[in-house]
């Protein structure tokens, strides 16, 4: 029997980042007391310069950071990616940072396709709890995702009205109260 390739798994999880490599076969495991499908992956990148001081040639690999990422589910079973991100240390300024990917925002544990699916569900008359249950996140997380998206699209409004305003039509009533 042939196992799935990295490309097949990447397509199923809607992953475009080629720097994420699947390291072993997926397994069914208990995550937060629920039997879940877990994929195992590693993220490494060739980084030339320190993100803090900008010096080249002073970076050393410094182990991995392991996270459980909520991934798109192909069934009703929760799906996660156990992602090991490469850590780097700058010998010049002693700063430590982790490899980044567009698949998951920095300091976030939810994959971008899941965030997009959550946002698309909000267009329908569905409660936050139901959306959270469907995508294996809390209702508070759903609300936070909605708020973050709204903040990105919020246009800055002026604090004062303009000095001159024009009206096409104006209707007045005789009642003054």
Where are these regions (language model features)?
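Short glycine/proline-enriched turns and hinge-like loops at secondary-structure junctions
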Residues: 33-34, 175-177
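Short, positively charged, Gly/Tyr-enriched micro-motifs
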Residues: 68-176
